Amino acid sequence: MKIFILVDALRSDYISQKNTPFLYNLSQKYYYIKKIKPSLGFCERSEIISGLKSEKTGFFTAIGKNKQKSEYIKMSKSMSILLDMVDSILKKIPVIRLFNKNLNWNKAFRKIINKILTKKHNAKMSSYKIPYRQLRNFYLTEDEINHFSKKFFNQSSLVNKILSKNISINNKAWTYLGKKNQMSENEVKKYLINKNKSQKNEFIFSYLGSLDVIGHKYGPQSKEMENELMKLDLFFKKLIKSNLNSTIIILGDHGMKTIKSYFNIEPHLKKIKYDLGLKINEDFNYFIDSTMCRIWIKDNFKKEDVINYFERQKELTENGAIISPKVSKKIYGDIIWLANEGVMVYPDFFHFNKPIGMHGYNNSLLKSQGTCIIYSPDGKNINIENENLSKINEIIMKDFV
Protein backbone atom coordinates (compact mmCIF):
# COMPACT_ATOMS: atom_id res chain seq x y z
CA MET A 1 0.00 0.00 0.00
CA LYS A 2 1.17 3.52 -0.84
CA ILE A 3 -0.10 6.57 1.05
CA PHE A 4 0.46 9.98 -0.53
CA ILE A 5 -0.22 12.91 1.81
CA LEU A 6 -0.25 16.43 0.46
CA VAL A 7 0.44 18.65 3.48
CA ASP A 8 -0.62 22.10 2.32
CA ALA A 9 1.97 24.78 3.24
CA LEU A 10 4.50 22.43 4.91
CA ARG A 11 7.38 24.87 4.54
CA SER A 12 10.92 23.59 3.98
CA ASP A 13 12.32 25.01 7.23
CA TYR A 14 9.54 23.46 9.35
CA ILE A 15 11.46 20.16 9.33
CA SER A 16 13.70 20.62 12.37
CA GLN A 17 14.56 18.95 15.67
CA LYS A 18 12.64 21.67 17.49
CA ASN A 19 9.42 21.86 15.44
CA THR A 20 9.03 18.31 14.12
CA PRO A 21 11.45 15.89 15.85
CA PHE A 22 9.91 12.73 14.37
CA LEU A 23 9.82 14.07 10.81
CA TYR A 24 13.35 15.42 11.22
CA ASN A 25 14.56 11.99 12.34
CA LEU A 26 12.71 10.44 9.39
CA SER A 27 14.42 12.87 7.00
CA GLN A 28 17.83 11.71 8.23
CA LYS A 29 17.05 8.04 7.57
CA TYR A 30 14.92 7.97 4.42
CA TYR A 31 14.32 9.82 1.14
CA TYR A 32 14.39 13.56 1.76
CA ILE A 33 14.09 16.56 -0.54
CA LYS A 34 14.84 19.59 1.60
CA LYS A 35 13.35 22.24 -0.69
CA ILE A 36 10.50 21.76 -3.14
CA LYS A 37 10.02 24.60 -5.63
CA PRO A 38 6.48 25.02 -7.01
CA SER A 39 5.65 26.87 -10.21
CA LEU A 40 4.51 30.47 -9.96
CA GLY A 41 0.81 30.75 -9.13
CA PHE A 42 -1.65 28.69 -7.11
CA CYS A 43 -2.08 25.40 -9.02
CA GLU A 44 0.15 22.94 -7.18
CA ARG A 45 -2.22 19.95 -7.34
CA SER A 46 -2.31 19.91 -11.14
CA GLU A 47 1.48 20.22 -11.18
CA ILE A 48 1.83 17.14 -8.95
CA ILE A 49 -0.65 14.98 -10.87
CA SER A 50 0.50 16.02 -14.36
CA GLY A 51 4.22 16.09 -13.63
CA LEU A 52 4.45 19.33 -15.59
CA LYS A 53 5.25 22.92 -14.64
CA SER A 54 2.46 25.48 -14.84
CA GLU A 55 3.89 26.87 -18.11
CA LYS A 56 3.22 23.45 -19.66
CA THR A 57 -0.12 22.64 -18.00
CA GLY A 58 -1.52 26.11 -18.65
CA PHE A 59 -2.78 26.27 -15.05
CA PHE A 60 -1.63 29.43 -13.29
CA THR A 61 -4.31 30.50 -10.82
CA ALA A 62 -7.45 28.72 -9.64
CA ILE A 63 -9.84 31.09 -11.44
CA GLY A 64 -9.69 32.27 -15.05
CA LYS A 65 -11.84 34.32 -17.42
CA ASN A 66 -13.96 32.52 -19.99
CA LYS A 67 -17.61 33.55 -20.13
CA GLN A 68 -18.67 30.43 -22.03
CA LYS A 69 -17.29 28.18 -19.28
CA SER A 70 -18.69 30.19 -16.37
CA GLU A 71 -21.35 28.45 -14.29
CA TYR A 72 -22.88 31.89 -13.66
CA ILE A 73 -23.32 32.86 -17.32
CA LYS A 74 -27.13 32.98 -16.97
CA MET A 75 -27.05 35.28 -13.94
CA SER A 76 -29.14 38.37 -14.79
CA LYS A 77 -27.48 41.78 -15.08
CA SER A 78 -30.14 43.46 -12.97
CA MET A 79 -29.67 40.93 -10.14
CA SER A 80 -25.88 41.40 -10.31
CA ILE A 81 -26.22 45.18 -10.04
CA LEU A 82 -28.64 44.88 -7.09
CA LEU A 83 -26.38 42.44 -5.22
CA ASP A 84 -23.35 44.69 -5.77
CA MET A 85 -25.30 47.66 -4.37
CA VAL A 86 -26.27 45.75 -1.21
CA ASP A 87 -22.72 44.40 -0.89
CA SER A 88 -21.30 47.94 -1.15
CA ILE A 89 -23.63 49.24 1.58
CA LEU A 90 -22.85 46.36 3.96
CA LYS A 91 -19.10 46.89 3.55
CA LYS A 92 -19.53 50.29 5.19
CA ILE A 93 -21.22 48.88 8.32
CA PRO A 94 -18.60 48.28 11.02
CA VAL A 95 -18.06 44.83 12.50
CA ILE A 96 -19.80 44.49 15.89
CA ARG A 97 -19.23 42.18 18.85
CA LEU A 98 -22.27 39.98 19.53
CA PHE A 99 -22.42 36.96 21.88
CA ASN A 100 -18.59 36.86 22.08
CA LYS A 101 -18.35 36.75 18.28
CA ASN A 102 -17.53 39.34 15.64
CA LEU A 103 -20.51 39.96 13.38
CA ASN A 104 -19.43 41.01 9.89
CA TRP A 105 -22.58 41.97 7.97
CA ASN A 106 -20.85 41.86 4.60
CA LYS A 107 -19.42 38.38 5.27
CA ALA A 108 -22.80 37.08 6.49
CA PHE A 109 -24.54 38.47 3.38
CA ARG A 110 -21.92 36.98 1.06
CA LYS A 111 -22.19 33.53 2.66
CA ILE A 112 -25.99 33.48 2.32
CA ILE A 113 -25.91 34.69 -1.29
CA ASN A 114 -23.16 32.20 -2.15
CA LYS A 115 -25.32 29.30 -0.92
CA ILE A 116 -28.27 30.55 -2.95
CA LEU A 117 -26.24 31.14 -6.12
CA THR A 118 -24.27 27.88 -6.07
CA LYS A 119 -27.52 25.96 -5.62
CA LYS A 120 -29.44 27.93 -8.26
CA HIS A 121 -26.68 27.65 -10.88
CA ASN A 122 -25.51 24.18 -9.78
CA ALA A 123 -22.07 25.73 -9.45
CA LYS A 124 -18.88 24.12 -8.18
CA MET A 125 -17.14 27.50 -7.95
CA SER A 126 -17.97 29.71 -4.99
CA SER A 127 -18.78 33.37 -5.67
CA TYR A 128 -16.12 34.26 -3.05
CA LYS A 129 -15.85 38.09 -2.96
CA ILE A 130 -15.93 38.53 -6.72
CA PRO A 131 -18.04 41.57 -7.71
CA TYR A 132 -21.38 40.14 -8.83
CA ARG A 133 -21.31 42.10 -12.10
CA GLN A 134 -18.10 40.30 -13.06
CA LEU A 135 -19.04 36.86 -11.73
CA ARG A 136 -20.47 35.55 -15.00
CA ASN A 137 -17.02 35.85 -16.63
CA PHE A 138 -15.10 33.51 -14.34
CA TYR A 139 -14.68 29.75 -13.93
CA LEU A 140 -12.50 27.20 -12.12
CA THR A 141 -9.43 26.39 -14.21
CA GLU A 142 -7.41 23.74 -12.39
CA ASP A 143 -10.52 21.97 -11.11
CA GLU A 144 -12.60 22.19 -14.28
CA ILE A 145 -11.56 18.64 -15.16
CA ASN A 146 -11.44 15.82 -12.61
CA HIS A 147 -7.73 15.11 -11.97
CA PHE A 148 -8.54 11.40 -11.69
CA SER A 149 -10.17 11.14 -15.12
CA LYS A 150 -8.29 9.84 -18.17
CA LYS A 151 -8.80 13.23 -19.85
CA PHE A 152 -6.41 14.92 -17.42
CA PHE A 153 -2.95 14.83 -19.07
CA ASN A 154 -3.34 11.25 -20.23
CA GLN A 155 0.33 10.48 -20.96
CA SER A 156 2.01 12.14 -17.98
CA SER A 157 -0.76 11.73 -15.38
CA LEU A 158 0.45 10.17 -12.12
CA VAL A 159 -2.98 8.57 -11.76
CA ASN A 160 -2.84 6.85 -15.15
CA LYS A 161 0.74 5.70 -14.55
CA ILE A 162 -0.28 4.09 -11.25
CA LEU A 163 -3.32 2.41 -12.81
CA SER A 164 -1.09 0.98 -15.56
CA LYS A 165 0.76 -0.91 -12.79
CA ASN A 166 -2.52 -2.61 -11.77
CA ILE A 167 -2.66 -0.62 -8.55
CA SER A 168 -6.06 0.76 -7.60
CA ILE A 169 -6.59 4.45 -6.78
CA ASN A 170 -8.25 5.70 -3.60
CA ASN A 171 -8.99 9.44 -3.52
CA LYS A 172 -11.64 9.62 -0.79
CA ALA A 173 -9.37 11.80 1.37
CA TRP A 174 -8.22 14.05 -1.50
CA THR A 175 -9.33 17.64 -2.09
CA TYR A 176 -10.42 20.00 -4.85
CA LEU A 177 -12.30 23.29 -5.04
CA GLY A 178 -16.04 22.78 -4.83
CA LYS A 179 -15.86 19.30 -3.27
CA LYS A 180 -19.09 18.81 -1.34
CA ASN A 181 -18.11 15.83 0.82
CA GLN A 182 -14.64 16.96 1.86
CA MET A 183 -13.32 15.04 4.89
CA SER A 184 -12.32 17.11 7.91
CA GLU A 185 -8.68 17.08 9.07
CA ASN A 186 -9.47 14.65 11.90
CA GLU A 187 -11.48 12.39 9.58
CA VAL A 188 -8.55 12.16 7.16
CA LYS A 189 -6.15 11.30 9.99
CA LYS A 190 -8.42 8.57 11.37
CA TYR A 191 -9.04 7.21 7.88
CA LEU A 192 -5.31 6.89 7.18
CA ILE A 193 -4.48 5.38 10.58
CA ASN A 194 -7.17 2.74 10.10
CA LYS A 195 -5.73 1.78 6.72
CA ASN A 196 -3.24 -0.48 8.52
CA LYS A 197 -6.02 -3.08 8.59
CA SER A 198 -6.23 -3.11 4.79
CA GLN A 199 -4.32 -5.65 2.71
CA LYS A 200 -5.43 -4.05 -0.56
CA ASN A 201 -2.81 -3.03 -3.11
CA GLU A 202 -3.83 0.58 -3.54
CA PHE A 203 -2.42 4.08 -3.85
CA ILE A 204 -4.15 6.52 -1.50
CA PHE A 205 -4.25 10.23 -2.34
CA SER A 206 -4.93 12.34 0.77
CA TYR A 207 -4.79 15.96 1.87
CA LEU A 208 -4.13 17.79 5.15
CA GLY A 209 -4.80 21.54 5.11
CA SER A 210 -4.44 22.77 8.70
CA LEU A 211 -0.99 24.34 8.22
CA ASP A 212 -2.28 26.45 5.34
CA VAL A 213 -5.30 27.62 7.36
CA ILE A 214 -3.21 28.48 10.43
CA GLY A 215 -0.44 30.07 8.36
CA HIS A 216 -2.93 32.43 6.73
CA LYS A 217 -4.81 33.26 9.93
CA TYR A 218 -2.03 33.49 12.54
CA GLY A 219 1.17 33.61 10.51
CA PRO A 220 3.76 31.00 9.48
CA GLN A 221 5.94 31.56 12.56
CA SER A 222 3.19 31.93 15.16
CA LYS A 223 2.70 29.96 18.38
CA GLU A 224 -0.39 28.44 16.79
CA MET A 225 1.78 27.15 13.94
CA GLU A 226 4.28 25.63 16.38
CA ASN A 227 1.44 23.82 18.17
CA GLU A 228 -0.01 22.50 14.91
CA LEU A 229 3.39 21.28 13.74
CA MET A 230 3.77 19.32 16.98
CA LYS A 231 0.33 17.74 16.46
CA LEU A 232 1.20 16.89 12.87
CA ASP A 233 4.51 15.37 13.93
CA LEU A 234 2.76 13.11 16.45
CA PHE A 235 0.24 12.07 13.80
CA PHE A 236 2.97 11.01 11.36
CA LYS A 237 4.72 9.08 14.12
CA LYS A 238 1.51 7.17 14.80
CA LEU A 239 0.73 6.70 11.10
CA ILE A 240 4.11 5.25 10.17
CA LYS A 241 4.29 2.99 13.24
CA SER A 242 0.91 1.56 12.30
CA ASN A 243 1.88 1.19 8.60
CA LEU A 244 5.49 0.00 8.71
CA ASN A 245 5.04 -2.11 5.58
CA SER A 246 3.60 0.74 3.52
CA THR A 247 5.26 3.51 1.53
CA ILE A 248 4.28 6.92 2.90
CA ILE A 249 4.93 10.06 0.85
CA ILE A 250 4.75 13.33 2.80
CA LEU A 251 4.77 16.34 0.49
CA GLY A 252 4.70 20.04 1.34
CA ASP A 253 3.72 21.77 -1.90
CA HIS A 254 4.69 25.34 -1.00
CA GLY A 255 5.71 27.57 1.88
CA MET A 256 4.23 30.67 3.51
CA LYS A 257 5.51 34.19 4.10
CA THR A 258 4.61 36.61 6.90
CA ILE A 259 2.83 39.63 5.42
CA LYS A 260 4.70 42.90 5.98
CA SER A 261 2.27 45.32 4.35
CA TYR A 262 -1.17 45.53 2.72
CA PHE A 263 -1.74 47.32 -0.56
CA ASN A 264 -5.14 48.47 -1.83
CA ILE A 265 -5.00 48.41 -5.63
CA GLU A 266 -8.69 49.21 -6.21
CA PRO A 267 -8.26 53.04 -6.35
CA HIS A 268 -5.80 52.56 -9.21
CA LEU A 269 -8.21 50.29 -11.08
CA LYS A 270 -11.02 52.84 -10.67
CA LYS A 271 -8.75 55.60 -11.99
CA ILE A 272 -7.72 53.51 -15.01
CA LYS A 273 -11.36 52.72 -15.75
CA TYR A 274 -12.40 56.38 -15.51
CA ASP A 275 -9.42 57.91 -17.35
CA LEU A 276 -9.61 55.49 -20.29
CA GLY A 277 -13.41 55.43 -20.47
CA LEU A 278 -13.58 51.67 -19.91
CA LYS A 279 -16.72 49.71 -19.06
CA ILE A 280 -16.86 46.57 -16.94
CA ASN A 281 -17.74 43.45 -18.98
CA GLU A 282 -17.61 45.37 -22.27
CA ASP A 283 -13.91 46.13 -22.67
CA PHE A 284 -12.50 45.79 -19.14
CA ASN A 285 -12.37 43.15 -16.41
CA TYR A 286 -10.06 42.53 -13.49
CA PHE A 287 -9.43 39.95 -10.78
CA ILE A 288 -7.66 40.66 -7.49
CA ASP A 289 -5.84 37.64 -6.09
CA SER A 290 -4.00 37.90 -2.79
CA THR A 291 -0.61 38.46 -4.41
CA MET A 292 -1.53 39.70 -7.86
CA CYS A 293 -3.91 41.77 -9.93
CA ARG A 294 -4.97 40.48 -13.34
CA ILE A 295 -6.49 42.73 -16.00
CA TRP A 296 -8.24 42.04 -19.30
CA ILE A 297 -8.40 44.86 -21.88
CA LYS A 298 -10.20 44.51 -25.21
CA ASP A 299 -8.41 47.43 -26.93
CA ASN A 300 -4.67 46.80 -27.50
CA PHE A 301 -3.90 50.54 -27.58
CA LYS A 302 -5.57 51.02 -24.19
CA LYS A 303 -3.69 47.96 -22.94
CA GLU A 304 -0.44 49.86 -23.58
CA ASP A 305 -1.89 52.84 -21.69
CA VAL A 306 -2.61 50.59 -18.69
CA ILE A 307 0.92 49.14 -18.76
CA ASN A 308 2.37 52.66 -18.92
CA TYR A 309 0.21 53.68 -15.95
CA PHE A 310 1.45 50.74 -13.87
CA GLU A 311 5.07 51.51 -14.75
CA ARG A 312 4.75 55.22 -13.93
CA GLN A 313 2.95 55.00 -10.60
CA LYS A 314 5.45 54.94 -7.72
CA GLU A 315 3.02 53.13 -5.39
CA LEU A 316 2.62 50.31 -7.92
CA THR A 317 6.33 49.97 -8.75
CA GLU A 318 7.28 49.98 -5.05
CA ASN A 319 4.84 47.19 -4.20
CA GLY A 320 5.19 44.93 -7.23
CA ALA A 321 5.82 44.64 -10.96
CA ILE A 322 4.17 43.51 -14.19
CA ILE A 323 5.30 40.00 -15.10
CA SER A 324 5.72 38.47 -18.55
CA PRO A 325 2.48 37.25 -20.17
CA LYS A 326 4.44 34.16 -21.25
CA VAL A 327 3.88 32.63 -17.80
CA SER A 328 0.18 32.11 -18.48
CA LYS A 329 -2.64 31.94 -21.02
CA LYS A 330 -4.94 34.85 -21.90
CA ILE A 331 -7.65 33.40 -19.63
CA TYR A 332 -5.52 34.58 -16.69
CA GLY A 333 -5.15 38.17 -17.88
CA ASP A 334 -3.69 40.43 -20.56
CA ILE A 335 -1.75 42.23 -17.84
CA ILE A 336 -0.54 40.54 -14.65
CA TRP A 337 0.89 42.58 -11.79
CA LEU A 338 2.65 40.49 -9.11
CA ALA A 339 3.16 41.83 -5.58
CA ASN A 340 6.60 41.87 -3.98
CA GLU A 341 7.46 39.34 -1.27
CA GLY A 342 5.57 40.19 1.93
CA VAL A 343 3.06 42.52 0.23
CA MET A 344 -0.57 41.42 0.17
CA VAL A 345 -3.12 42.93 -2.18
CA TYR A 346 -6.03 43.74 0.14
CA PRO A 347 -8.98 44.02 -0.27
CA ASP A 348 -8.93 41.06 -2.64
CA PHE A 349 -11.60 38.71 -4.02
CA PHE A 350 -11.19 36.09 -1.27
CA HIS A 351 -10.58 37.40 2.26
CA PHE A 352 -12.96 39.21 4.63
CA ASN A 353 -10.23 39.69 7.24
CA LYS A 354 -6.58 40.56 6.76
CA PRO A 355 -4.48 37.36 6.75
CA ILE A 356 -1.14 37.29 8.57
CA GLY A 357 0.56 34.86 6.19
CA MET A 358 0.42 34.40 2.41
CA HIS A 359 1.95 32.37 -0.45
CA GLY A 360 1.95 32.82 -4.21
CA TYR A 361 5.04 35.02 -4.36
CA ASN A 362 8.21 34.51 -6.40
CA ASN A 363 8.76 30.73 -6.27
CA SER A 364 12.55 31.03 -5.97
CA LEU A 365 12.20 32.54 -2.48
CA LEU A 366 13.18 30.11 0.30
CA LYS A 367 10.04 30.71 2.35
CA SER A 368 7.88 30.02 -0.71
CA GLN A 369 9.18 26.45 -0.95
CA GLY A 370 7.87 23.19 0.44
CA THR A 371 9.57 19.90 1.30
CA CYS A 372 9.23 16.13 0.86
CA ILE A 373 9.96 13.04 2.98
CA ILE A 374 9.28 9.52 1.72
CA TYR A 375 9.26 6.57 4.10
CA SER A 376 9.49 3.07 2.63
CA PRO A 377 10.07 -0.27 4.43
CA ASP A 378 13.38 -0.92 2.65
CA GLY A 379 14.28 2.73 2.13
CA LYS A 380 17.76 4.21 2.32
CA ASN A 381 18.80 7.71 3.25
CA ILE A 382 18.90 9.85 0.12
CA ASN A 383 19.29 13.56 0.73
CA ILE A 384 18.47 15.99 -2.10
CA GLU A 385 18.90 19.73 -1.56
CA ASN A 386 16.21 20.99 -3.95
CA GLU A 387 13.83 19.83 -6.65
CA ASN A 388 10.90 21.16 -8.68
CA LEU A 389 7.41 20.19 -7.51
CA SER A 390 6.64 18.84 -10.99
CA LYS A 391 9.39 16.20 -10.55
CA ILE A 392 7.55 14.46 -7.68
CA ASN A 393 5.44 12.59 -10.23
CA GLU A 394 8.55 11.05 -11.82
CA ILE A 395 10.25 10.33 -8.47
CA ILE A 396 7.21 8.45 -7.14
CA MET A 397 6.92 6.28 -10.25
CA LYS A 398 10.64 5.60 -10.59
CA ASP A 399 11.47 4.70 -6.99
CA PHE A 400 8.30 4.03 -5.01
CA VAL A 401 5.66 2.32 -7.19
Where are these regions (language model features)?
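Short, structured active-site-proximal loop/turn typified by the sulfatase FGly-forming signature C/S-X-P-X-R
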Residues: 15-63
